[in-house]
UniProtKB/Swiss-Prot annotation:
Residues spanning the membrane: none
Pfam (any one): HIGH_NTase1
Species name: Syntrophomonas wolfei subsp. wolfei (strain DSM 2245B / Goettingen)
Assigned GO CC terms: cytoplasm
UniProt-recorded name of the protein: tRNA(Met) cytidine acetate ligase
Reactions mediated catalytically: cytidine(34) in elongator tRNA(Met) + acetate + ATP = N(4)-acetylcytidine(34) in elongator tRNA(Met) + AMP + diphosphate
Amino acid sequence: MAILGIVAEYNPFHNGHLYLLEKSRQQGDFSATVVVMSGNFLQRGEPAFCDKWARAEMALTAGVDLLIELPFCFATRSAYYFAKGAVQLLQRSGVVTHLAFGSESGQLSQLQEIAGILAHEPESYKTALKKRLSQGWSFPLARSSALQEYMGGEKKQLQEILPGPNNILALEYLRVIEEEGIPLLPLTIPRQGSSFHSSDLSPYSSARAIRQALYHNLDWEKITNSISPATEKILQREIALGRAPIGPDSLEQAIMVNLRLVSTDYLREIYEVSEGLEFRIKEATNSCGTLEELRQFIKSKRYSLTRINRTLLYTLFALSKNQVELYDQHGPQYLHILGFSAKGQEILQKIKIKSKLKIFSRGSEMKQARDKNPGTALAEMIKLDCQATDVYSLLFPNPATRRAGRDFTTSPVPGT
């Protein structure tokens, strides 16, 4: 039995996601589709536009069968660790056979060749990479340049492939599959429509363009070309209930307050803080009044704005280097079910037989596992996910909806 796996954020679900879903299904005789989806915080270090259950519901209306949450400790990391956590979660489900993903290039063999270099790190490539990093280059730029040097004659092709955000994730999925010998069969579908950074609205608008339109209260008629009627209905409901929209800098005051209260010793223990960055953050905090000012103050040749954004999020959640080491050593420890269709419920029964991971389809199961396993990777991962949900809930526009403990009280979203 072939089961299709996809990794996504669905922030929100749009026509491009539907295109990937439909085109991927055409590549084989798949009995179901399982999606690993980020929770309330995303890979760029930002909160989602609306919560994870609303986004899961959007996907279910489009034909996804089962949605599993990617834990915060992987969902908010760099592309490699995001991909690693997601691919491990699909593999550890015990039932997923294929992994589909979008890419700007659409050339699987080409992407696999590059991913093989990243996985095995030939000596000359490694030397070129270290040289650039020692010169203060950011990791993405250093890696891109080192690959171009190593692959020589394919420089022009690489210059077209490496910057694409979908290609970047595609390479990391393939790299993890190669490194760990994971038996997932990869499929790539060429990306359709506007680039991530485009603000144009079209039938294949980027999620960013749709969010920007919603933040600025543009006419729904302009937005509906990019999303399904079901997604529109869910978005309108969440906005009416005061559970959306959540802006990318909604945590600004919380982060700024926390940074002014903590010490450089505290910051030094935070994941991704190194080479004296704690002093730069502290200096910036005392002289800046907004997150954007803070990011611009801290950014450098080595630290990109996205990396800084993630690091600032880690400071709020006190995500330490030791914690991350624990999470990476053990990988995903559970399957938190966000939603399922009737077919998804059948797949879930198969997962219960084949997977060694704990499965949480009731909040009480999650709470019990956390309380009975103190200090373990399992308990710490659950604790962090629940903290993330509780903090996220405070961002809802409607104060009446901001209660804590929603992971323990919210059931998986039912599909058809």
